[in-house]
Curated annotation (Swiss-Prot):
Lineage: Bacteria, Pseudomonadati, Pseudomonadota, Gammaproteobacteria, Alteromonadales
Function: One of the primary rRNA binding proteins, it binds specifically to the 5'-end of 16S ribosomal RNA.
Name of this chain's protein: Small ribosomal subunit protein uS17
One GO CC annotation: cytosolic small ribosomal subunit
Taxonomy, superkingdom: Bacteria
GO molecular function: rRNA binding; structural constituent of ribosome
Amino acid sequence: MSDTIRTLQGRVLSNKMDKSITVAIERKVKHPLYGKFLKRTTKIHAHDEQNQCNAGDVVTIRECRPLSKTKSWTLVEVVTKA
């Protein structure tokens, strides 16, 4: 196992859950045949202890131990407010 903690940056889609947020992570994938770069989005549930995020915020999250069935990421900081 590596010692580096995975961190990602994404946009908050939803904050309707208590102490939880849904973050959209965008990445670019090259099409195997045509070579065009396509945007692909992954939704991740993250833990927000102080309920400080709103929809549209750009945030940094890091991986942690599983906190629930779907949450294994936690909020590090809010980069920009919506």
